[in-house]
């Protein structure tokens, strides 16, 4: 609003029609990371695409570090330990993104037998050195200093970190596209 932008909200199933009805293409499409694959197939490659999670990484964290963490996904081996960290304390649902979807996607993508640990809210392990990767939520429920402290801890322990959005982009083959949002 401060930049005098016009925002249009729609569901994935109506996105094609919305784009067709615009006189000019949008400058940017922001989606939920879980819809990356479907949205990327609808939105022309000339239109910038990102997600709320990626924007949070840029706003509260170190986007370059998290992009590097996405590359670490390809280096995972059988029995590597992965920490899935969520900053909020929501009630987990049957098909929860952190405890169900991400482990399933990572196992399928890598073809490896991976071991997962989970943390939520203010809880973040003191010793993270045994993890080969940290997958962190976008951090919308914690402040910038808290998110950067977690990232600094990962950096000091030499443990790659990726956020949910970049993980979904990597797995769907659109990491480069979504990281070019400026």
Where are these regions (language model features)?
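P-loop NTP-binding site
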Residues: 1-182
